[in-house]
Amino acid sequence: MSRLSKEEIGKRLLELIKDETKPAIGCTEPVAVAFTVATGKKYMTGEVLKIDLKVSKNILKNGKSVTIPNTEVCGLDIAGALGEICGDSEEGLFVFKNVNKDYLDKAKEMIKNKVVTLNPIENTDPVFVEATLKGEKDEVIAILRGGHTNIEKIIVNGTIAFEKDNKNEKDNKDCDFIKELSLKDIREITEDIGIEKLDFIMDGIEMNKEAAKEGLKREKGLTLGSSLLKLQQEGKLGKDSATIARILTAAGSDLRMGGGMCPIMTSGGSGNQGLCVILPINVVAEDIKASKEKLQRAVFFGHAVNNFVKKYTGKLSAICGCAIAAGIGATAGIAWLLGGKDKEINGAILNMLANLTGMVCDGAKGSCAIKLSTSASEAVISAYLALNDIIVPNNTGIIGNTVEDTINNLGMLCKDGFYKADDVMLSIACKEVI
């Protein structure tokens, strides 16, 4: 356990999960670009004549091929243009809520007239956007770093107009504390936290259930969820909880990646991860008729484990965080929900890591639904296997001596082993941009 008291750890963990579990409309990488531009525009006194965007390679990879809400088009340049035209920075992750056809037409005209430029930038935080807005009299530079709505600095005509006090932010959040915990610590906090503090968990469950429902009805993205449902109705797929989790998670991702306006509750700052953590746990809870309190705690545990894993792998990385980090969170929550103790919870996580480690991130797009659906299904199966004492042995391959060692191994693989792979994937996925 951390040097902090258990009470303080519980308080910080709750703050962290609340901070990283918020509703969003649309993929959070285009959102980050639009939000940065919209924030910068507030400091302009006249018309914006030019927007120069610089983004991290991870923002570029994860934002270039995903449909912007209510548009049927993709592109970070379009996202930036919409941020200038109709973005409201006060709305945070809902910055796209006002998008309509008229605004889209104006954004397309801006792109046609080369008002917006987009370039990747090397050697920066994985979540990084710099937007330079130029007018007749003003030049405003807005810099976002470390989080999808975390504005770090605003420079107006060469003078710093706003700079975030990172020291106070560190003192208040100190998110790295979670790396000092074990999975057992997180599980104990999950069981001890006052249930009245977890009302926001139910909001996320209902929100993502509705997104999955809408995804099954609407022709969005890859339409994987509705296609899987049809196969199930034809008797070609089963009606077990693993298959239902696969279908619903795919449907939610279809909607989100396909530009649906339905809000999604995020996990670790990602809507797809929110779908992958919440929906499989909820499916199992409904199957076994778990109590509302058990469901809330299981989903909270899932969010916490997802954030724990991402402290090792990074917020955006070369591996598919939705399938792996969120999938690990889901299987941990399911194993706990099914009555598993630390052995079974850890075993479910090890089963997932032995299975899906190595699934690369090739950017956010419609086919993310396939990866999410795989992870959702495997999260259910891995938990049930662990409850039946089927657990991969220690010290084999990526699997270390403990579950924490294994997650650390995953982090090493991401940061040391896959760094070059991420560059290669960027060149493949974004060749027309870079």
From Swiss-Prot:
| One GO term (biological process) | L-cysteine catabolic process to pyruvate
- Which residue spans traverse the membrane? none
What highest taxon heads this organism's lineage? Bacteria
One Pfam family linked to the record: SDH_alpha
GO MF: L-cysteine desulfhydrase activity
Q: Which HAMAP family match?
A: UPF0597
List the PANTHER family hit by this protein, alphabetically. Answer: UPF0597 PROTEIN YHAM (PTHR30501:SF2)
**Family statement drawn from the similarity comment of this UniProt entry:** Belongs to the UPF0597 family.
Provide the protein name.
Answer: UPF0597 protein CLK_1462
What organism is the protein native to? Clostridium botulinum (strain Loch Maree / Type A3)
